Amino acid sequence: MARIAGIDLPKNKRIEIALTYIYGIGRPTAQKILEQANIDGNTKSDDLTENQINSIRHVIDSHYKVEGDLRTEVSMNIKRLMDLGCYRGLRHRRGLPVRGQRTHTNARTRKGPRRSVMGKRKKA
């Protein structure tokens, strides 16, 4: 089992798909990585040689920010917005949608489950 960027890649999948198990690598990025490493995307991940695995590791380490580094950068960006006190930062702080969606109705994913209010009942 190949281990790249601290993630065990699944054995039975094509390497193009297996690379997407790494946080920060999607299908297009996986294709670019394999192109730079001169590896066919249809190769199963357990059929890779040690040389090929090392070349993939080298490409990822030198060109891409993945896993812990990327998670840290994203959380630091959000923290920076919150510290600035800008509109987006306030929305993050309050747990509301950040990108202009309506909140009068909907936005339940971001706001969480409904809180019931006493006295708001249909009259019989």
Swiss-Prot record:
It holds the Pfam family Ribosomal_S13. Residues 95-124 are annotated as: Disordered. SUPFAM superfamilies: S13-like H2TH domain. Keywords: Ribonucleoprotein, Ribosomal protein, RNA-binding, rRNA-binding, tRNA-binding. Coiled coil: none annotated. The keyword RNA-binding applies. One of its GO terms (biological process) is translation. GO terms for molecular function: rRNA binding; structural constituent of ribosome; tRNA binding. One of its GO terms (cellular component) is cytosol. Part of the 30S ribosomal subunit. Forms a loose heterodimer with protein S19. Forms two bridges to the 50S subunit in the 70S ribosome. Belongs to the universal ribosomal protein uS13 family. Located at the top of the head of the 30S subunit, it contacts several helices of the 16S rRNA. In the 70S ribosome it contacts the 23S rRNA (bridge B1a) and protein L5 of the 50S subunit (bridge B1b), connecting the 2 subunits; these bridges are implicated in subunit movement. Contacts the tRNAs in the A and P-sites. This is Small ribosomal subunit protein uS13. It comes from Syntrophobacter fumaroxidans (strain DSM 10017 / MPOB).
